[in-house]
């Protein structure tokens, strides 16, 4: 109550921000008469002037009014588009490192030019982030004339681009690209073996278009560069044949025992599956019968846990992942569908063997599992930028998450014209059949009035079902879903024509507007050399169609079901009512819809029974709509908790990632690392000596023979340590360390002399390669640790604290191994001829090409804890740490050198 009173008197925080920015807008408007008389050369020269003033100490905030006035003038001349005042407010919001919520059709692409130009003045580069290659290319080419009129360069980054082209694009003042490409290029740069192979400059400023899609919907999907690992396709196929033998146990009412027993249970809210006691027994019998498990073996023996993991993956593939809902089969491949956008995601794969299980289910080629070489998340990648901003049509519902995770405030920008769309209350039916009948009836009615209709669906399957029913009803229509995405631009261009009916999944219109009457530009583009008369006729025809649609009440939106997120529903509604156009939106729901069935059905059914509803009748009341929104908020809260949990775990890996990547960059920049190599060599010698000659010990406790053998085996160096001691009875451990260090330094110096100046380059290359190999192993070990860490909760330990502690231990071990491995390699390296070197390089390139490095935007398999986030007790993991070449020795195992000591006190110890 007090909060409402305060807002009534002082206005909301958003109102106060808009008022503050309004003063800046007036300053920019006042400068317009100064910039209009400038010729093109003088306008372009303004950029050099601004840069000079910036270098002399003026801040970007001080330059803002003039820079925005210059950008507005350039847009007027180059594009014939003048920024509205609300667009200037959007630009100020972006410059200040916040999120601008701007409704559909308000010109977000043009708004970005203001902040991009101002932040391009320091010359550090500005990245504008889009959701797909098409938009990256389109926006770069569309806005290029504005930037070039101001003397700035523009580049675009797309997939499958030549590295030289990418370097050129990143060197531009303004770079457009997709979130995936920026992230992958960051990882590639941190795998480069030469500094000239890197593409990105330090990350200064980014404007993220559709920021909710990228920073929230994509937050849980890690970017992974991987290489092929072992092939388990035969096992996946064998397990897939067993799955149909397992029967689902029906869900019992809360607090009651199940009336019918089955082999597994499904928790639809958590999207998880667990085997029952009967299920475990049957699975063991089936595995033994098919020769996958020994007669006397237990499924729960450590060596067989991978089989249980495969069974659970197979069950989830069959019962939680449905064709044409979560994925489609295209060109013999399982291609995932983004639940938020409805678009296909080629190249993205489910983790933990789930994708392979789906491939086995669908009978397509099973791709080998992969081994991670580098990875990050969008959450951590975008937080590297010095300044981050974003824009979208729907951000306010997620304002808390943007603030918590990214430190970004949301500013709701007013529309240039008031929104005239009518958002009607939901209609709720008892059954899906009743709902579809009502939709068909209303589509017919709207068509009869010449109103264009957009029917929004949540899946490919629903869109195809709606299409079938419309066809049966004799209603002509277009379908836009993941299968027809090639025709997206054409379908959207015609969706606003009088009486047009378009069925679309969530993919409809991200980055494109449905223009009432259809897009006249699309008609002109189809003509090869249109004459002035043809263009005039097309425009005249469009005006007539436009008027017809306006009279019919604009675009009519029909939502066939509610999404888990209110934001996705708002995006569908936002397709209508652009730039003050009329429009109408309504959702048609049934108690059999997923969201209603899982989260809201009991309450809804009680309401409907109280009202005495019958088949075919619908309920329409604000109270019901509020109840549905409450269910959505519950789901959104749960999803936020999972994303936050993911970030807390990834932050641990991210701290280590930053250390390793900073070390790599120092290495790449350094011309000579001889001093660092010398320090590492001294550390390794001291550690080896300490393992065999314990500090403050007597000579009888020294294992000189073991040390001599280790130096010979590991470093190829024969050192007469015993002879030194026999010749000098006064030599203590310090004297031995000094002499051993001197001798090892001499041996290394002779090797350097034999190899020549190339040794300095070789040292750097070898250190990079050893670091990369160990980092790759470390990522696998971290993943294995993460998969089982939640089980520590059963021992009354905090899993997050345990993860931090153990991951730090793993990281320390990795740094120790780096010193040992590098020293071993450097002492064993032999001088070779130029011809041998060329042959080795040729072989290395051939091997690299055959290694099939993959770029994966790996989809964690749902929001459930057991999929890529926190495993449940019912689903043990099969993942094992990456095994290094040769025998892997545990820290507490006997050292393989034969000393009789534990490995951690011998070769595994570093002083």
Swiss-Prot record:
Stretches with biased composition (Basic residues): 901-911
Chemical reaction(s) catalysed: ATP + H2O + cellular proteinSide 1 = ADP + phosphate + cellular proteinSide 2
Organism superkingdom: Bacteria
MF-aspect GO terms: ATP binding; metal ion binding; protein-exporting ATPase activity
EC number: 7.4.2.8
Keyword Metal-binding among UniProt keywords: yes
Cofactor(s) listed: Zn(2+)
Stored InterPro entries: Helicase_ATP-bd (IPR014001), Helicase_C-like (IPR001650), P-loop_NTPase (IPR027417), SEC_C_motif (IPR004027), SecA (IPR000185), SecA_CS (IPR020937), SecA_DEAD (IPR011115), SecA_motor_DEAD (IPR014018)
Positions annotated to bind ATP: 87, 105-109, 513
Topology versus the membrane: Peripheral membrane protein
Annotated GO biological process: intracellular protein transmembrane transport; protein import; protein targeting; protein transport by the Sec complex
Cofactor binding annotation: May bind 1 zinc ion per subunit.
UniProt entry tagged with the keyword ATP-binding: yes
Biased composition annotated in UniProt, kind: Low complexity: 862-875
Subunit record text: Monomer and homodimer. Part of the essential Sec protein translocation apparatus which comprises SecA, SecYEG and auxiliary proteins SecDF-YajC and YidC.
Protein name: Protein translocase subunit SecA
Name of the gene encoding the protein in the UniProt record: secA
